[in-house]
From Swiss-Prot:
PANTHER family: HOMOCITRATE SYNTHASE, ISOPROPYLMALATE_HOMOCITRATE_CITRAMALATE SYNTHASE FAMILY PROTEIN. GO terms for molecular function: homocitrate synthase activity. It comes from Cereibacter sphaeroides. Belongs to the alpha-IPM synthase/homocitrate synthase family. This is Homocitrate synthase.
Amino acid sequence: MSRQQPRASFLPESPLAPVALCDTTLRDGEQTAGVAFTRAEKRAIAEALQAAGVAEVEVGVPAMGEEERADIRAVAAVLKTAAPVVWCRLRAEDLAAAQRTGVVRLHIGVPVSERQISAKLGKDAAWVRDKVEKLVRAASWAGHKVSVGAEDASRADPFFLAEIAHVAAEAGAIRFRISDTLGVLDPFAAHELVGRVVTRCPLPVEFHGHNDLGMATANSLAAARAGASHLSVTVNGLGERAGNAALEEVAAALEAAGRATGVALGQLCALSELVARASGRPLSPQKPIVGEGVFTHECGIHVDGLMKDRATYESADLRPERFGRSHRIAIGKHSSAAGLARALAEAGLPADAATLAALMPALRDWAAITKRAAAPEDLAALLAAQTETAR
């Protein structure tokens, strides 16, 4: 008989177990170079996250000073169903600063790779173990709910990683976070790392992914598949360097996979637009889920298929209505004659065969020059120009 691997009691028995999303837009997202939120913006973002059903909101770093602590208190005051969380370094003074905010939940970031321990802290593994035990125990005794984050976990010794998880658990921590701080994992490595920790860690596991290789969303899904019960995200993927796993992408992908998140998908676009304005980071039209153009079709073959049966070019899990959106048919270089005829008719313009034959080449030239889709007024102008040329 084969021996079964030990299984933590919290490990989901079903691959469809729900996943809690922990948003860090107001902390890690604001660490994006050049991004800074006002207090009013922070409160508005926190309220929007709460309305969207996000489970936890990291609201700031108390050690930054009294102004930041005042912001944290103001933001925490509007959170009723979403739990506010503050972020601390592995320092007693950070814990003291956190206690002045009145926030119960706090997260302690712990460097766990040899490079970060020696170069950043100037310490060794024994010092880190001792510090984690003392600070987590002190915070727990003070009434805080403490999560511990393993920074640079993807480059850490796996045995030391497991050891820190056990030290944190014994000291009173409620969750253990695996941070791919440099964004170096791929989904296969993320699944392996998280799965290894989940089977050895006595705590629920959270995954925090960065997007340096463009795989933060995929890595987050792999982590959930491996047993992570919580995923760290930011709106629009804001974050240092290439950013973090995007809330809207992770929520949509998990729901499509049958994993409940508690997030109202129809709220994501408004939330995304709010953060885009507050951060000064406009969205790409092709940003998955929330970009202006992600439910727009121009290619004649695709448009023809959609008109006959939406399922030809649309997944049931990605119907625009799920996100409070609708389809848009764009007219441009790749439009078919039928699509152009439909657009002309809707604009009250002639759509006979002769008009289409004359207008199609002009439309393609116009699209190559203007680099955009044609609006009804553009079609009218093109038609007028063709009529004038024909005289």
